[in-house]
Amino acid sequence: MSKECDRKMLFNIKSLMLPLDSITEFGDECYAHLSEDGNQKETLTEHTRRCQKYWFNIVEAKHIETVFIKFEQLYMGDITNEARYIFELMSVNVVTLHDIGKINPLFQKLKMKNNWKREYAPESISSRHSIVSAIFYLDYFLDIINTAKGDGRINRNESDVLKDFAYIHSYIISRHHSDVNSLEYFFDGLTGKNKQNDNSGEDAYKWYEMFKQELYEEPVVKLRKYDEWLDRMVYQSNEKNIYLYAWTRLLYSLLVAADYYATSEFMSGYENNDYGNVNNIDNIINEYENNDVQKSILNYEKNIKRLDEEQFAKVNKDTVIGNIKGINVLRTEMFLETENNLKNNIDSKIFYLEAPTGSGKRNR
């Protein structure tokens, strides 16, 4: 067992993040972006480091590592430290490999004006890079999983679950420049069975297979049939599937945000240090509490007895209480109830507050 696995992993993100040059030697030969005037080029290595920096900063600023740990406990359960290590390595390095597909020679030629390894230019996928990155990711981590299973460091069940995540994470990478659609659509594309004839996944796999064989004389890990994965999801509890859905959306959001910040830094020269955290809270509260709507609510709270359920149900457009009329009575009552519940749970993590259309959410 590796030294990293001598203890229980708790998402030590910086130690888990891989340098790009440990995965490919082409990071400094290939470019990720051009400046608007075309005079400056950002290498793939530079872009990856920026993305990793922002990914880490967002996780740290939002305390997302606690979510990682909780998900790992709830979804993965009792697994070996080696399996835990591989899972965490796979999760953290979604950002590391998300643009590695830009070593596609046609992307370099058509997008970066870089005539790099033209003899390996793909015929079927043009300059696309996201789906190529997804294949790179799959091959890299499926190989790690297979090796660990072959060495007896992880068992078959752990191998199956880790492979599930390898496919899910590669799917996230494939969609990082677009919306999240059907995972089944992605699997169909990998196997050449996409009903909309979008078999770019299979085409990217075939190109990558040729590229790796020509350069390194190494085979690409064979892709599995996704029926096994779908069967596992069907028989898995709804609760675990909800965890998995939330995990997928979280990693997708983190990747897109980090990529955006990193690209913006290169294009503008501005290094972002604000991740939506509120630092001037006293000024904001003072400004907010002095607007007319909030003054009206505070006056209502001070001078009017709160409605019980029966009274609340009888409020209509002609109801007048104090200087508040109709639907604004309902909005005021809902605001005060929400505020009281929030104050009573001020030390809790609150992720979602639901309110119907027309309830005055903009004032909250």
Regions found by a protein language model. Name each.
Residues 51, 59, 94-98, 133, ...:
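Conserved structural-core and active-site-/substrate-pathway-adjacent residues in large, well-folded domains
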Residues 44-48, 323-347:
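N-terminal pre-P-loop "Q-motif" helix
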Residues 123-135, 164-175:
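Elongated alpha-helical scaffolds
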Residues 1-123, 305:
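Acidic/His-rich, divalent-metal-binding segments that scaffold phosphate/diphosphate chemistry
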Residues 65-79, 145-161:
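Intrinsically disordered, low-complexity domain-flanking/linker segments in eukaryotic proteins
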Residues 346-363:
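Walker A/P-loop
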Residues 1-29, 53, 148-319:
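N-terminal accessory nucleic-acid engagement/regulatory domains that precede
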Residues 46-58, 127-143:
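An active-site-proximal "capping" alpha-helix that borders the catalytic cofactor pocket
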